């Protein structure tokens, strides 16, 4: 019996991960490439067993990743999937199950975008899940849930972080922040229901939402 040790490289094929969003509710077949993935590489060690000069067994003895696989990430449409990553109370029948302090139905929403480092008039960094309001109606820092009545478009939980002329003059009730100009154009005017949470309920989710904001360093994800 003779043993031989050998090593060979194996490719780790890239995988595709999908991110669901209702952002594309007007173009439901649209897919957006968020990140192009790449194959990884691993080094695999084997022990080969030879009997009377013939290979009779091959046993893997070690596997080490040399290059990590990077998955491809694609964003696509899914009804009722929120645009925002922020969280709040469970949604039941299209609205938060607890803590609603004020409800505004069939309100005119518009869309806007800014630079990745932009901050709203409240001082908060703008991301998906930050919106412009009339702060005399909805105070800065308020947590709210925003959705179309039919659920085909769900912006999700959002914080009042900015204002603008349209909100102050009443030509729009709320301006939803998007991370690209094209997204803001695609979703320019939408009739939405806005459910503003009371401060005690919002406070329950502050720590988790602060962590989500801190982790959100990659536009489009």
Model-derived features: positions:
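Extracellular modular ligand-binding repeats in secreted and cell-surface proteins
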Residues: 1-101, 138, 211-218
């Amino acid at each position: 019996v003779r043993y031989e040790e050998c090593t060979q490289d194996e490719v780790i094929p890239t995988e595709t991960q999908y991110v669901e969003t209702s952002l594309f509710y007007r173009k439901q077949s649209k897919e957006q490439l968020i990140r192009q993935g790449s194959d990884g590489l691993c080094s695999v060690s084997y022990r080969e067993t030879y009997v009377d000069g013939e290979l009779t067994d091959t046993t893997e003895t070690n596997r080490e990743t040399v290059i990590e696989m990077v998955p491809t990430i694609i964003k696509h449409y899914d009804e009722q999937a929120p645009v925002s990553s922020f969280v709040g109370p469970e949604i039941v029948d299209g609205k938060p199950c607890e803590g609603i302090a004020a409800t505004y139905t069939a309100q005119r929403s518009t869309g806007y975008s800014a630079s990745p480092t932009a901050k709203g008039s409240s001082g908060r960094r703008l991301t998906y899940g930050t919106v412009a309001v009339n702060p005399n109606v909805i105070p800065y820092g308020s947590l709210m849930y925003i959705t179309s009545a039919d659920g085909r478009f769900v912006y999700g939980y959002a914080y009042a972080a900015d204002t603008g002329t349209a909100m102050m003059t009443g030509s729009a009730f709320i301006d939803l922040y998007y991370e690209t100009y094209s997204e803001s154009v695609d979703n320019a005017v939408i009739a939405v229901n806005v459910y503003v949470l009371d401060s005690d309920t919002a406070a329950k989710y502050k720590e988790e939402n602060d962590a989500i904001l801190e982790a959100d360093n990659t536009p489009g994800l």
